[in-house]
């Protein structure tokens, strides 16, 4: 771990041989070529960095990364610098500033970090899908994990021994669902891929190394199948989804597509073992041909069967590790009453129920509740009560929790679970496991639980989205001993 945090040796030496100087110059050139193409938010406030502290060289030195992977320089003013790595001295341009906190972008680098590496994707500099391919993946996780640990210790006053080792999966091919943007204004020259960062422009792709196969290898042939058809203009976006049994191409269209286009796409898909699903403007789904439903296996023989627009955890391996960790932390016992809030299709619900607990699954999307219930019945799981509820309605939430539960699992969206947490400190289940995709709202909600009589016993990150700013985390709360 220690060598992940060391600074570039080239910066630490005052004397270098001619060959070392040449190597360092080449390294700087490569690094500056990288940052020249990095994607940054534009701002009317952008201006050249020029403070009394560094007016002579217009540069700052990066000490660490924050949990999102931005370079951090601490001092009287704190700088968060996109595209910069620990140990690098960077010329920067300010994007925005507020009091003594500055957001900036890297203009050039004097002596690249040993952690800097060439992106493995040829369109990384343009594409908005990934943000962190310029750093060694293990080092990025180590820095970000440590930054999040420090943030939680500072904001929540958690004790030693709470922070757990990260849950890690495959890199880079990990993503089993993606939404592709399309530019078909010229049907003879269609662009299909992801959007540029902070732009509506589409980066044209043939493959994507982040996606699992056959999703990655389907992009180029899919674009070729669409080209030449005028009704391709009516396609809003295309989703690619990989189950464990099949994969799907889901085409969202605003007006009817011509039969010839559908037939050509279906022929392309069949050749690659894919199913085609059409989604009209009203959200109705129609399979082309004899498309099979998707099956995604999880743990303990459980599985979910998502529809095209259902939320799923996009990293299969990390998702299974999260479920297993939740089972260990919750320790569900036969006949215990356990509530699974924001339950979706039953990703956590079904494995918990398999342990014999009496589970109430509460979800805000009615269609997902119906599919989850049907899916559970097909697997012979009957000890779950499936409820559709407005999860932001205080009265409904409190009424549901008044039934009394031994343990609770939360897996909310990025908005968090503030209403539910306020109700939980009144209902007082003995154990709460919180799964979060937004550390900021998690910290807010955790304060409610801690102030309401709980202590954070365990917590840690799950690397659900390698090479991006996003970070998943999990925490175990238990009632504080009086």
From Swiss-Prot:
Q: What is its EC number?
A: 2.1.1.190
Q: Where is this region: Disordered?
A: 1-33
Q: Name one GO molecular function term.
A: rRNA (uridine-C5-)-methyltransferase activity
Going by the record, the broad EC class of this enzyme is: transferase
**Where along the chain is S-adenosyl-L-methionine bound?**
313, 342, 347, 363, 390, 411
Query: Per UniProt, which keywords does this protein have?
Result: 4Fe-4S, Iron, Iron-sulfur, Metal-binding, Methyltransferase, rRNA processing, S-adenosyl-L-methionine, Transferase
* Pfam families, sorted: tRNA_U5-meth_tr
Does the record's keyword annotation contain S-adenosyl-L-methionine? Answer: yes
Which Gene3D superfamilies does the record cross-reference, listed alphabetically?
A: 2.40.50.1070, Nucleic acid-binding proteins, Vaccinia Virus protein VP39
Low complexity bias locations = 15-28
InterPro entries, alphabetically?
23S_rRNA_MeTrfase_RlmD (IPR001566), MeTrfase_TrmA_AS (IPR030390), NA-bd_OB-fold (IPR012340), SAM-dependent_MTases_sf (IPR029063), TRAM_dom (IPR002792), U5_MeTrfase_fam (IPR010280)
Where, in this chain's numbering, is [4Fe-4S] cluster bound?
121, 127, 130, 208
Report the domain of life of the source organism.
Answer: Bacteria
Q: Which BP terms in the Gene Ontology apply to this protein?
A: rRNA base methylation
**Residue ranges of every copy of the TRAM domain listed in the record:** 51-108
User: Where, by residue number, is the active site?
Assistant: 437
Q: Name the reaction it catalyses.
A: uridine(1939) in 23S rRNA + S-adenosyl-L-methionine = 5-methyluridine(1939) in 23S rRNA + S-adenosyl-L-homocysteine + H(+)
Q: Which family does the similarity line name?
A: Belongs to the class I-like SAM-binding methyltransferase superfamily. RNA M5U methyltransferase family. RlmD subfamily.
Biological role: Catalyzes the formation of 5-methyl-uridine at position 1939 (m5U1939) in 23S rRNA.
Listed name of the protein: 23S rRNA (uracil(1939)-C(5))-methyltransferase RlmD
Instruction: Supply the source organism for this entry.
Output: Alteromonas mediterranea (strain DSM 17117 / CIP 110805 / LMG 28347 / Deep ecotype)
Gene (name only): rlmD
């Amino acid at each position: 771990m220690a060598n992940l945090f060391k600074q570039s040796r080239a910066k630490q030496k005052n004397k270098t041989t001619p060959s070392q100087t040449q190597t360092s110059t080449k390294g700087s050139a490569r690094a500056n070529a990288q940052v020249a193409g990095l994607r940054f938010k534009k701002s009317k406030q952008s201006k050249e960095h020029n403070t009394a502290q560094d007016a002579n060289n217009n540069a700052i030195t990066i000490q660490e990364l924050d949990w999102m992977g931005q370079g951090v320089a601490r001092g009287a003013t704190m700088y968060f610098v996109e595209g910069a790595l620990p140990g690098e001295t960077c010329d920067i341009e300010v994007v925005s500033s507020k009091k003594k906190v500055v957001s900036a972008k890297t203009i050039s680098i004097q002596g690249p970090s040993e952690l800097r590496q060439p992106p493995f994707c040829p369109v990384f500099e343009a594409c908005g899908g990934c943000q962190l391919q310029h750093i060694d993946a293990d080092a990025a996780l180590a820095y970000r994990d440590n930054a999040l640990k420090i943030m939680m210790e500072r904001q929540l006053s958690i004790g030693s021994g709470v922070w757990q080792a990260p849950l890690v999966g495959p890199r880079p091919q990990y993503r089993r669902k993606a939404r592709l943007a399309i530019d078909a204004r010229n049907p003879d020259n269609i662009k299909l891929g992801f959007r540029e960062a902070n732009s509506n422009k589409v980066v044209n792709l043939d493959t994507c190394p982040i996606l699992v196969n056959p999703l990655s290898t389907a992009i180029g042939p899919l674009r070729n199948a669409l080209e030449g058809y005028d009704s391709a203009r009516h396609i809003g976006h295309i989703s690619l989804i990989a189950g464990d049994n099949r994969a799907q191409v889901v085409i969202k269209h605003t007006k009817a597509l011509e039969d010839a286009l559908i037939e050509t796409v279906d022929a392309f898909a069949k050749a690659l073992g894919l199913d085609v699903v059409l989604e009209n403007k009203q959200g109705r789904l129609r399979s082309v041909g004899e498309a099979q439903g998707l099956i995604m296996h999880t743990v303990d023989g459980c599985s979910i069967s998502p529809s095209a627009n259902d939320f799923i955890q996009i990293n299969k391996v990390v998702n299974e590790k999260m479920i297993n960790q939740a089972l260990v932390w919750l320790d569900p016992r036969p006949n215990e009453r356990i509530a699974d809030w924001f339950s979706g299709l039953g990703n956590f619900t079904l494995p918990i129920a398999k342990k014999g607990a009496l589970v109430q699954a509460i979800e805000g999307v009615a269609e997902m509740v119906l599919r989850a219930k049907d899916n559970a019945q097909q697997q012979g799981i009957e000890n779950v009560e499936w409820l559709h509820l407005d999860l932001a309605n205080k009265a409904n939430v409190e009424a549901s929790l008044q039934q009394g539960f031994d343990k609770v699992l939360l897996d909310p969206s990025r908005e968090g679970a503030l209403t539910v947490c306020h109700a939980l400190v009144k209902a007082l289940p003995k154990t709460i496991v919180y799964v979060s995709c937004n550390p900021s709202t998690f910290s807010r909600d955790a304060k409610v639980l801690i102030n309401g009589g709980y202590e954070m016993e365990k917590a840690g990150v799950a690397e659900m989205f390698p090479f991006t700013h996003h970070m998943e985390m999990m925490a175990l709360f238990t009632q504080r001993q009086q």
